[in-house]
Amino acid sequence: MLVHAHPDDESTGTGATMARYANEGATVSLVTCTSGELGEVVADDLAHLRGNPDALGEHRRGEIAEALRELGDIRHHWLGGPGRFRDSGMAGEDTNDAAECFAKADRDDVTRAMVEILRAERPHVVVTYDDTGGYGHPDHIAANHALMYALGPAADPAYLPELGEPWDVPKVYWMTLPRSFVKDVQAAGIEGFEPFTVPDEDITAVLDGRDHHAKKLAALRTYRSQVSLDDGDFFATLVQDPRFAIEHYVLVRGERGPGSGPHNWENDLFAGLD
Ligand SMILES: CC(=O)N[C@H]1[C@@H](O[C@@H]2[C@H](O)[C@H](O)[C@@H](O)[C@H](O)[C@H]2O)O[C@H](CO)[C@@H](O)[C@@H]1O
Ligand SMILES: [Zn+2]
């Protein structure tokens, strides 16, 4: 199970991982916390969505449905239901304080909604952002908190038993990028990734999803409101590189399974589970 903040985050950060496990017949579920109502609309033929959060949210809900079909058989949940928690906007924007935004949502409401999904899906592995949200977006940080604060209650038989049988998630990973990745892409002229990386020795798992790079690209292409892969900017250049389908994780809960290479990286998130 993967927990992401906005439509398109799942494909950008973990699309190849999702495609690999869906291809292998594993049960892959996704929790998206907001519909991304405040995103910048990059496609001029979608200009009518600019300044119309409800319309953009509805449009992005359609985009993610199409994107997930490109990745494989993915079970999709909106945290609290579609539109329940709304996009908080980029860090520092006034919208970060809007009553209905995800970053300001009531902790009990968020935990209840996440526990309901955790107990329904009973995932052996859960993936989300690190506690910086990857790049500091309030909704990404809130998504990390939504999962991490729900792990205890989900496993507690005394917590809202009406939400289902308790479930203790065996393994949790946070997504990240190794510092070596930056050196690789800098050689290709792609700058700006350094702040979002960790030392290679801090990585615990690497999923080489290059066999699924095409699916990751196809999923990203469905997000026309947010992503243009043909404008030659650094992101468009990055995603075309097959190395973009190599996805890296740090284990933050559970036992590390067998690995390989100089840092003994796991190459399977289910490593060590029976
Ligand atoms: C990848 C991601 O998390 N995107 C978020 C982010 O989008 C950025 C935002 O629209 C900003 O104004 C742009 O300049 C930047 O290029 C975008 O990546 O924040 C949005 C608002 O919270 C969110 O909807 C989008 O999914
Ligand atoms: Zn996001």
Swiss-Prot record:
Catalytic activity: 1D-myo-inositol 2-acetamido-2-deoxy-alpha-D-glucopyranoside + H2O = 1D-myo-inositol 2-amino-2-deoxy-alpha-D-glucopyranoside + acetate
Keywords for the protein's UniProt record, in alphabetical order: Hydrolase, Metal-binding, Zinc
InterPro entries hit by this protein: GlcNAc_PI_deacetylase-related (IPR003737), LmbE-like_dom_sf (IPR024078), Mycothiol_biosynthesis_MshB (IPR017810)
Gene Ontology MF terms: N-acetylglucosaminylinositol deacetylase activity; zinc ion binding
Metal-binding among keywords: yes
Enzyme Commission identifier(s): 3.5.1.103
Binding site for Zn(2+): 6, 9, 140
Listed GO biological process terms: mycothiol biosynthetic process
SUPFAM superfamilies reported for this sequence: LmbE-like
Cofactor (UniProt): Zn(2+)
Record text on cofactor binding: Binds 1 zinc ion per subunit.
Job description of the protein: Catalyzes the deacetylation of 1D-myo-inositol 2-acetamido-2-deoxy-alpha-D-glucopyranoside (GlcNAc-Ins) in the mycothiol biosynthesis pathway.
Family: Belongs to the MshB deacetylase family.
Name of the protein this chain belongs to: 1D-myo-inositol 2-acetamido-2-deoxy-alpha-D-glucopyranoside deacetylase 2
Organism: Saccharopolyspora erythraea (strain ATCC 11635 / DSM 40517 / JCM 4748 / NBRC 13426 / NCIMB 8594 / NRRL 2338)
Source organism phylogeny: Bacteria, Bacillati, Actinomycetota, Actinomycetes, Pseudonocardiales
